[in-house]
Amino acid sequence: MTKREYNSQPEMKEEVLAYLLQLSASLVLPVAIWLIAAGQIFTCLRGYTISNYQEKVEEKLCSTLVDKISEKLADLFPVYGITPSRNAPFPTILEQLLATVSQEERLAYLSNMYNSLIEMGIDSPCFYPIVQTFLFLMGGGGGPA
């Protein structure tokens, strides 16, 4: 037997929790992000297996970060004098930016973006490329960052 097999849900839960903690520590994720993702992960744990749990945890963390970055951008755009549009919602803008990032680097990219926006707001080096991508998607010139 080359892979560990789990006979019970608690063993899988421990493995998932350990991996989530490892990712959170290495990416310097805020506790709020960790708690939201953990809650979502543990509600759908039955679909997790030893062969897919890492990918599923990373996907859930990415989607949680996209949601939280979107919330932060909704607060920052008015400060910058821009009204967000339904034609270019923040998750769409973030997906456009993520298109240039490898799958392996997406979680770190989103984590860095979130932390930068939280710490520096509109002065974050991440903010201008987001605005530029927003304007591009709205047809207002510029281009994807």
Swiss-Prot record:
The keyword Membrane applies. It is a single-pass membrane protein. Keywords: Membrane, Mitochondrion, Transmembrane, Transmembrane helix. The chain crosses the membrane at residues 16-36. GO terms for cellular component: mitochondrial membrane. It is found in: Mitochondrion membrane. This is Uncharacterized mitochondrial protein AtMg01350.
